[in-house]
């Protein structure tokens, strides 16, 4: 969820592997067919949303959160479930489209795509930078946890309550 003043906006998407990175491809209420998206349909065949591959970006594994549909209101839960079911039914098409958009953008061939797409290589560089920033924090947190346990064990007699 992203906070927008008094409201939270749920950011929903698909995580898939592209160029050895986890990529997050957002799902949007945008319902117009474009060459850089896949329309998502409900059980009646009506378009309900789309996967926007031009806006996909690499995401560190630690930042990926799984949405619990059961925590949502019934109507919204039904929408999420329909999107999820449809996406699972076309997994191969989704993977193929993500890789196609990624390669086409990086080839520099499609000038319109260059104007309307995220710069995947730059985002990958920034993702690696961010991950290198996170790794020392994780190591410090893990070391701190070990230290705390060692200190607790050493000073156990000092803080135990006599009975």
What are the residue ranges of the model-derived segments?
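Sparse, context-dependent recognition of short Cys/His-centered cofactor- or disulfide-binding micro-motifs
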Residues: 9, 41, 79
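Short N-terminal edge-element motif at the start of the domain
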Residues: 1-8
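Compact nucleic-acid interaction/catalytic patches
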Residues: 6, 17-55
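Short beta-strand-centered aromatic/proline hotspots
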Residues: 11-15
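C-terminal terminal-subdomain/extension
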Residues: 44-163
């Amino acid at each position: 969820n992203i906070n927008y003043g008094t409201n939270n906006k749920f950011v929903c998407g698909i995580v898939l592997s592209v160029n050895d990175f986890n990529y997050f491809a957002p799902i949007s209420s945008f319902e117009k067919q474009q060459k850089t998206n896949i329309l998502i349909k409900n059980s009646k065949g009506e378009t309900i949303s789309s996967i926007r591959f031009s806006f996909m970006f690499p995401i560190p594994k630690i930042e990926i959160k799984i949405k619990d549909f059961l925590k949502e209101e019934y109507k919204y839960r039904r929408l999420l479930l329909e999107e999820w079911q449809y996406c699972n039914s076309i997994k191969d098409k989704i993977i193929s489209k993500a890789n196609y958009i990624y390669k086409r953008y990086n080839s520099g061939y499609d000038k319109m795509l260059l104007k309307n797409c995220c710069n995947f290589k730059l985002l990958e560089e920034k993702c690696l930078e961010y991950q290198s920033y996170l790794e020392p924090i994780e190591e410090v947190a893990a070391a701190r946890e070990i230290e705390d346990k060692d200190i607790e064990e050493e000073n156990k007699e000092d803080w135990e309550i006599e009975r």
